[in-house]
A protein has these predicted regions:
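Short, small/polar residue-rich loop motifs at catalytic or cofactor-binding pockets
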Residues: 106-108
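Short, Lys/Arg-rich nucleic-acid/phosphate-binding segment
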Residues: 36-38
Length: 126
């Protein structure tokens, strides 16, 4: 029988790992735990999964919502919030940090945001 394997890191490609990691540090209050040329990892004491940022000079931001023939998002992160009031507070904070609220929203249970490199992410109450 195989030993269980856990997710350790979620890595986002981007052109500038430093600026994108700085955005997530401000927004989430996480700490930088690793940095070398082209890769930065962030961690939180309350979360076992780290978020990483990897330099990819050929990175093309996804279009959201998806459009035929355009770069599609391949994965996105959902950040858990306590309730609707906490979600609204985090949306305002994310905007102040440099995110944009997506024009298309499909539920009151989550809010879709776009980070400075174009990656969609959500705050959700699920």
């Amino acid at each position: 029988m195989l030993e269980q394997v856990l997710i350790g890191n979620v890595i986002l490609d981007c052109i500038d790992p430093k600026s994108l990691s700085d955005f997530y540090i401000r927004m989430l209050n996480w700490e930088k735990t690793y940095e070398d040329e082209g890769v930065i990892l962030l961690a939180s004491a309350s979360c076992s999964v780290k978020i990483g940022f990897q330099r990819n000079l050929d990175y093309i931001p996804p279009v959201w919502p998806e459009l035929p023939g355009m770069q599609q998002m391949q994965v996105h992160m959902d950040f858990k919030v306590r309730d609707k009031a906490h979600m609204e507070s985090m949306v305002e904070h994310a905007i102040a940090c440099g995110a944009v609220k997506a024009k298309e929203q499909y539920s009151e249970l989550w809010t879709v945001m776009i980070d400075p490199a174009g990656h969609p992410f959500c705050f959700d109450t699920l």
